[in-house]
Amino acid sequence: MEEFSTIGLDAVVGSVGNGSTLRLISDIEGVRYTEGRFLPYFFPDTFHEGGDPVKEAKENWITARRAILRKPIDRIGYGGYLKLTLDFPEFLDYVENMCNEFRELYTNAKGITPYCVKKVAVLNSWGKIRSWGCHMVHHALYQKQNYSYAGIIEALSGAPFDVRFISFDDILANPEILKDLDVIINVGDGDTAHTGGGIWENPAISAAIREFVYNGGGFIGVGEPSGHQFQGHYLQLADMLGVEKETGFTLNYDKYNWEEHPDHFILADTTKPVDFGEGKKNIFAYEDTEILVQREKEVQMAVHEFGKGRCVYISGLPYSFENSRILYRSILWSTHGEKDLHQWFSSNFNVEVHAYVKNGRFCVVNNTYARQKTVVYRGDGSSFPLEMEANEIKWYNI
């Protein structure tokens, strides 16, 4: 919020549950510093005989580190009863190593805009005022009804994109803002503030978005994008997306398109059937749509071209390293950016690359608790093989 810079607030300190909560804090402007309080809190529920605070600390740090590499907070800390840590020297050793890693990270990344392959806007009814928190329920707690959508935001929190959050009112006030974007993402259930609800009855909204895509922009819809029953359609961008939801009004329509096309750019790195989380029922495809995944004649993923632009439909995408790669490839494909794949890129989706070109540095980070092998691609497309220890981060000069 712009008010942070005018109310005399010195700093914002927040608890870090994942990458989204980290970005919610670190993206705040107009304060002297931002600080993240990491888990575990120094309370007896973790710091007791037989407890494993190191495990929780590792999980929390590795999850948040992706986001810190995109937009660092200024300080890190913990909260609770310090005395409880005295019986866990291995925890103190891990925190020392974590702090040293943070200092190096901060030195290389603070104040430097990292390499961003595309400009991405998450479109909902709130826009910037709920940046990163739009799919968050009580500080990133798991909710069955929400995790399939929150995964999109979590993946974006540590991905090499220039991410912004825009509202439908922003588009109505100035449709020209879309010209500065590469792709729009609309994610959530229909008839909610996440996807817009009744705002789709305003023709100016659908006209602006259709124009953006028709002229070459990308659109990714997750769940029930543009979902609102109006003028014979539930998905108001059904013709653009190439899919529609059967709500009972078109049961007598023949639906012939069920053939899957799994050999697609978007799915090239998948190692197992795609995890759509809760997924969606009753989604069908139009005849000129390319279905990537359907299960029991319910479309879970599809792509469709609209004018010069491209659209991707996904029924849900919980956060995982593999799903993060699927979203990455979806964004590239929707923006005709396949040629940009091998720029600051890791062939292994468990490993990520972040480049700080202005600073002349880049890093490769292993997001897992196991050794990993990968091929790292530099900005010019050249590459080198790399083996990494669990959780390791390596820094290089460009």
Question: Model segments located where?
Answer:
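A short, well-structured beta->alpha microelement
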Residues: 153-177
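C-terminal beta-strand-rich structural cap/linker in extracellular carbohydrate-active enzymes
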Residues: 183-187, 385-398
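A short helix->loop->beta-strand "cap" motif at the edges of active sites that frequently abuts
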Residues: 30-32, 215-218, 309
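Short, well-ordered secondary-structure micro-motifs within conserved domains or adaptor modules
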Residues: 10-14, 175-198
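Structural motif
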Residues: 182-192, 220, 311-313, 363
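Hydrophobic targeting/anchoring helices
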Residues: 1-146, 249-253, 257-260, 268, ...
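A glycine-rich, often tryptophan-bearing local segment used as a flexible ligand/cofactor-contacting loop or short
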Residues: 196-272
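Catalytic beta-strand/loop cores that center a nucleophilic Ser/Cys/Thr
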Residues: 252-307, 315-326, 332-380, 384-389
